[in-house]
Amino acid sequence: MASLNSDVIMGESSSISVPSSSSKNSKRFELKKWSAVALWAWDIVVDNCAICRNHIMDLCIECLANQASATSEECTVAWGVCNHAFHFHCISRWLKTRQVCPLDVCEWEFQKYGH
């Protein structure tokens, strides 16, 4: 009876070709190059900041304006308990005048911020 590792197909015919012992040890294929591809996205429904309208993974308008300066900070994302996400700079500027979420007008409370 053929083992599970061989390429022999068991059928009703009387002639069965069994691979020789030398072909069992040879490689069936050799991997010479492997290029991995991966995609990711934020776990949010809307992927644009509703304040500056830039993509949430891109720089906010404040960071874009200060891009030439040597002290440009990292542009992070801030989530509220309502699960709306904004650039941290954008929501900080918004919260100086109103303490509510710009989208659902619920009282703003940080759930998390950073990448």
Swiss-Prot record:
Zn(2+) 1 binds at C49, C52, H87. Not detected in floral buds, stems and roots. Keywords: Cytoplasm, Metal-binding, Nucleus, Ubl conjugation pathway, Zinc, Zinc-finger. Zn(2+) 3 binds at C82, H84, C101, D104. GO terms for cellular component: cytoplasm; nucleus; SCF ubiquitin ligase complex. Pathway: Protein modification; protein ubiquitination. It comes from the Eukaryota. Zn(2+) 2 binds at C60, C63, C75, H89. InterPro entries: RING-box_E3_Ubiquitin_Ligase (IPR051031), Znf_RING (IPR001841), Znf_RING/FYVE/PHD (IPR013083), Znf_RING_H2 (IPR024766). GO terms for biological process: auxin-activated signaling pathway; jasmonic acid mediated signaling pathway; protein ubiquitination; response to auxin; response to jasmonic acid. Part of SCF complexes, which consist of a SKP1-related protein, a cullin, a RBX protein and a F-box protein. Component of the SCF (SKP1-CUL1-F-box protein) E3 ubiquitin ligase complex, which mediates the ubiquitination and subsequent proteasomal degradation of target proteins. The SCF complex plays a crucial role in regulating response to auxin and is essential for growth and development. Through the RING-type zinc finger, seems to recruit the E2 ubiquitination enzyme, to the complex and brings it into close proximity to the substrate. This is RING-box protein 1b. It comes from Arabidopsis thaliana (Mouse-ear cress).
